[in-house]
Amino acid sequence: MSSLSVYHVSSPDMPNKVLTHLEDIASTLAEHGVAFDRWEAATPITPGASQEEVISAYRTQIDTLMTERGYVTVDVISLNSDHPQKAELRARFLEEHRHGEDEVRFFVAGRGLFTLHIDDYVYAVLCEKNDLISVPAGTRHWFDMGENPHFVAIRLFNNPEGWVANFTGEDIAGRFPRLED
């Protein structure tokens, strides 16, 4: 089940609130310009599936998002626990960073913890299959796929170069809960 845990930056061990209803999660995130919605990921996809397989299976949803929101590039991150670079990828995504464009992810299998650092609060969004999250450009965040990743997410970009991160150099991500496998 998707959830949102909200922490004050000074209290990484105790969330101020935990939300599990879509409407509550979406409205809380919307206060900060973050869109959270459910889309149907009806085509079965196994983590580790190729980018081509995933894009082909979800071409209709991808085209809709690209047309409605002006995205120009799409890619897929598809990882399972057998991936040879899982530790390196996890370490890179766990560093707080921001992007010069919106970050959009449609989870079509598995789950991941997308954590946002906004002002004095940290919003940990557990995203699962069917979740669509859109984080505004410039928002500090990190992503945890767990020690044994099991997820597939379609990523959409305004930038033709795709995923370009600007790391903040802050160590805040290490102080907050991570995805439990």
Curated annotation (Swiss-Prot):
Catalytic activity: 1,2-dihydroxy-5-(methylsulfanyl)pent-1-en-3-one + O2 = 3-(methylsulfanyl)propanoate + CO + formate + 2 H(+); 1,2-dihydroxy-5-(methylsulfanyl)pent-1-en-3-one + O2 = 4-methylsulfanyl-2-oxobutanoate + formate + 2 H(+)
Annotated site, May play a role in transmitting local conformational changes, chain positions: 102
Residues at which Ni(2+) binds: 97, 99, 103, 141
Binding site for Fe(2+): 97, 99, 103, 141
Example GO biological process: L-methionine salvage from methylthioadenosine
Annotated metabolic or biological route of this protein: Amino-acid biosynthesis; L-methionine biosynthesis via salvage pathway; L-methionine from S-methyl-5-thio-alpha-D-ribose 1-phosphate: step 5/6
Site (May play a role in metal incorporation in vivo): 96
InterPro entries in the cross-refs: ARD, ARD_bac, RmlC-like_jellyroll, RmlC_Cupin_sf
Enzyme class: oxidoreductase
UniProt-annotated site: Important to generate the dianion, residues: 105
Cofactors, names only: Fe(2+); Ni(2+)
Keywords carried by this UniProt record: Amino-acid biosynthesis, Dioxygenase, Iron, Metal-binding, Methionine biosynthesis, Nickel, Oxidoreductase
EC code(s) of this entry: 1.13.11.54, 1.13.11.53
Function noted in UniProt: Catalyzes 2 different reactions between oxygen and the acireductone 1,2-dihydroxy-3-keto-5-methylthiopentene (DHK-MTPene) depending upon the metal bound in the active site. Fe-containing acireductone dioxygenase (Fe-ARD) produces formate and 2-keto-4-methylthiobutyrate (KMTB), the alpha-ketoacid precursor of methionine in the methionine recycle pathway. Ni-containing acireductone dioxygenase (Ni-ARD) produces methylthiopropionate, carbon monoxide and formate, and does not lie on the methionine recycle pathway.
Family: Belongs to the acireductone dioxygenase (ARD) family.
Protein name: Acireductone dioxygenase
